[in-house]
Swiss-Prot record:
Organism: Caenorhabditis elegans
Keyword Transmembrane helix assigned: yes
Subcellular localization, as worded in the UniProt entry: Membrane
GO CC field: plasma membrane
Entry similarity comment: Belongs to the ammonia transporter channel (TC 1.A.11.2) family.
InterPro entries the UniProt entry points to: Ammonium/urea_transptr, Ammonium_transpt, Ammonium_transpt_CS, NH4_transpt_AmtB-like_dom
Functional note: Involved in the uptake of ammonia. Implicated in aging.
Tree of life domain: Eukaryota
Protein name: Putative ammonium transporter 2
Length: 515
C-alpha cells in the first residue's frame, strides 16, 4: 500500500490525460460521438458470435452447442451484472474516501432518474457510453468461458459470468475513470489490455487450473479433439472484424479532431495482426512443416491483444512490430502449457495472458505522447507529451508503472477468480460436470441433442475400430441404465410399495453409488 501511495504522489506532479465520461459531457462529447460509440458497440458485440464459433470449433463435437450457449449466457448474465452494479463500480461517483479504487452510485443504470434538467443530448451520451462499455465487459466473461470448455455445468457458468463482469468493472475503474488510481498515475491502456484481456486471461487460467484437465487429455494416447476447423477460422474472422471497432472506438469520439486517433488505431490494429500473422506463419511452418490452424489463430489473436494497450498511440511501424513480438511470445508459450499439463482448449493463456502482458509493456517502450485533442481546452481534456516511452526519452517511470499495473491487476484477478470458483464449487450448484456427462457430452445431457451428437462424434473420430467401440460402449451403457431404471420403477409401481416419483429418486441414487 505504501508503494501504491508513493507512486500516486509521484504521479500527482506529472501531467496526465484528463477524461471524464459523465460529468463534462456537455463540453466533450457530441451527438456524433454518441453515434460513433453506439455503432461501434454493435460491431463489438459480433465478437461474441466469433468467440462462440471459435470455441465450439476447437472442442469435441459432443460439446459444440454447449459452447455456443455459454457465449449467449455471457451476454445475458454479464450484461445484467453490468447494468445492476458494473457500470456504477466503474464510472460511479469517485468523490469519497475510496474513490480512487472503486466507483459508487449509478447502480441499476437509468439516466432518466438522475435529473429531469439533463438535456436530451446528455442522456443520449450516457446511454451510448453504457452500451459501449457493456460490450467490453461481456467480452471479459467470454474469455473466461473459453478456459472452462467441456468441464463446467451450464448453471454454474451463469454465476461465473455474472461475477467475473463485476471483477472487470472494478479494474476498469482503476484504469479508465478520471479519478481511478492507475489513471491518475498515468497508465497507458487504450482499449482494455489490462481491464479486459488481463482480467479475463488470468481468470480463465485460474479456472482451467481449478477444474483440472479434461478426461484423458494428457493420457498416453490422448489427443486434442477439434470438431470443426472451418468453424473455428470463421469465428476468428468475426473476432478480427470486431477488433477493429474494439480498438478504433476507444477514443470515444470523432469530433474535436479526435477522429485522427481513431484512424491511427484502425491502421495500427490491422498492421499489428498482419505483422503477427507473418511471424505465426513462419513459426508454424518451421516447427511443424505445416500451417497449423490452432497456431495460426492463436498467434494472430495474440497480436491483436498486444495492440490494445497503445493502439491510440502506435505508429504503423510500431504497431507491426508490437504485433509480431506478441505473436512470437504467445507461440513460445505453447510448449509450456503442454509441459505443465495445462488443459487450455482455446489458448486463453498464450493469447490473453501472454498477449496482454506484452501489450501493457509495449507502450512503455514505444509511446510518444504527441498532443491529442480530447475536446476544448477549458474541459482539461488535453493529453501530455512529457511522459513518453523508453525510445523517446521517457525514462523508466512508465515501464515501472505498466509493470506494476500488470502485477496488481493480475493478482487481483487471480484471487477473485479463485474465490468465485471455490464458492460455487462448494455450493449446491456445483462446478464441474460428472464423468458420464463429460464422456457423453454436454450437448446430449444439457440440451438433449443425442442424434446430432453421436453422428458428428463418429465423423470427427473417422470411425476407426477403437473409437467406434468406445462410442458404442458409452451409448449401450447409457441405454442399459435407462432401460433398467424404467423396469425397476415399473416393477415397484406395480407392487404399490413406493410412489413412482420416489422410485425414480431411489433408482438414480443406486446408479450414482455404483459409478
Amino acid at each position: 500500500m505504501n508503494t501504491l501511495q508513493n507512486l500516486t504522489l509521484k504521479m500527482d506532479r506529472q501531467p496526465t490525460i484528463r477524461m471524464k465520461p459523465d460529468k463534462q459531457l456537455d463540453c466533450s462529447l457530441s451527438q456524433d460521438d454518441g453515434v460513433w460509440m453506439m455503432a461501434s458497440s454493435f460491431i463489438i458485440f459480433t465478437m461474441t458470435a466469433g468467440f462462440g464459433l471459435l470455441e465450439s470449433g476447437r472442442v469435441s463435437s459432443k460439446d459444440e452447442v454447449n459452447c455456443m450457449v455459454k457465449n449467449v449466457f455471457d451476454v445475458i448474465f454479464g450484461g445484467l451484472a453490468y447494468w445492476m452494479f458494473g457500470y456504477g463500480l466503474t464510472f460511479g461517483d469517485s468523490k469519497h474516501q475510496l474513490g480512487r479504487y472503486v466507483g459508487f452510485g449509478d447502480f441499476f443504470f437509468d439516466p432518466e432518474r438522475v435529473s429531469d434538467d439533463d438535456s436530451t443530448d446528455e442522456k443520449g451520451i450516457s446511454y451510448s457510453l453504457f452500451i459501449f462499455q457493456m460490450s467490453f465487459a461481456t467480452t471479459t466473461s467470454t474469455i473466461v468461458s473459453a478456459g472452462m470448455s467441456e468441464r463446467i455445468h451450464l448453471k454454474s457458468h451463469c454465476f461465473i459470468s455474472f461475477f467475473i463482469t463485476l471483477v472487470h468493472s472494478v479494474a476498469g475503474h482503476w484504469v479508465w475513470d478520471q479519478e481511478g488510481v492507475f489513471r491518475m498515475m498515468g497508465v497507458v491502456d487504450s482499449a482494455g489490455c489490462s481491464a479486459v484481456h488481463l482480467v479475463g486471461g488470468v481468470s480463465g487460467l485460474v479456472a482451467t487450473l481449478y477444474l483440472k484437465p479434461r478426461r484423458n487429455r494428457f493420457a498416453k494416447n490422448g489427443i486434442r479433439t477439434v470438431s470443426d476447423p472451418t468453424k473455428a477460422i470463421l469465428g476468428f474472422l468475426m473476432i478480427w472484424w470486431g477488433w477493429l471497432a474494439f480498438n478504433t472506438s476507444s477514443n470515444y469520439a470523432v469530433t474535436h479532431g479526435q477522429w485522427t486517433e481513431g484512424m491511427r488505431s484502425a491502421v495500427g490494429t490491422i498492421l499489428a495482426s498482419a505483422g503477427g500473422g507473418v511471424v505465426t506463419v513462419i513459426i508454424t511452418r518451421l516447427s511443424t512443416k505445416k500451417i497449423q490452424m490452432d497456431m495460426l489463430i492463436d498467434g494472430m489473436l495474440a497480436s491483436l491483444v498486444a495492440s490494445t494497450g497503445g493502439c491510440l498511440y502506435f505508429t504503423p511501424w510500431q504497431a507491426t512490430l508490437v504485433g509480431a513480438i506478441g505473436s512470437s511470445l504467445a507461440l513460445a508459450a505453447y510448449p509450456v502449457t503442454e509441459w505443465l499439463k495445462i488443459d487450455d482448449p482455446v489458448g486463453v493463456f498464450p493469447v490473453h495472458v501472454v498477449g496482454s502482458i506484452w501489450g501493457m509493456i509495449a507502450p512503455a517502450i514505444f509511446v510518444y505522447r504527441r498532443p491529442m485533442n480530447f475536446g476544448p481546452p477549458e474541459c482539461d481534456f488535453q493529453t501530455s507529451d512529457e511522459i513518453n516511452g523508453l525510445l523517446y526519452g521517457g525514462g523508466f517511470y512508465l515501464l515501472f508503472l505498466q509493470s506494476f499495473v500488470i502485477l496488481v491487476i493480475g493478482t487481483y484477478s487471480a484471487i477473485c477468480a479463485f474465490i468465485i470458483l471455490f464458492l460455487i464449487h462448494h455450493s449446491p450448484v456445483g462446478l464441474r460436470v460428472d464423468k458420464y456427462t463429460e464422456e457423453l457430452g454436454a450437448d446430449l445431457i444439457e440440451h438433449g441433442l443425442a442424434g446430432f451428437n453421436v453422428m458428428t462424434y463418429t465423423i470427427e473420430k473417422k470411425l476407426d475400430t477403437k473409437t467406434l467401440s468406445a462410442v458404442l460402449m458409452i451409448i449401450v451403457r447409457w441405454r442399459a441404465k435407462a432401460k433398467l431404471g424404467a423396469q425397476r420403477r415399473k416393477k415397484i409401481h406395480d407392487s404399490g410399495s413406493v410412489a413412482p416419483q420416489q422410485a425414480e429418486s431411489v433408482e438414480m441414487n443406486v446408479i450414482h453409488r455404483r459409478h
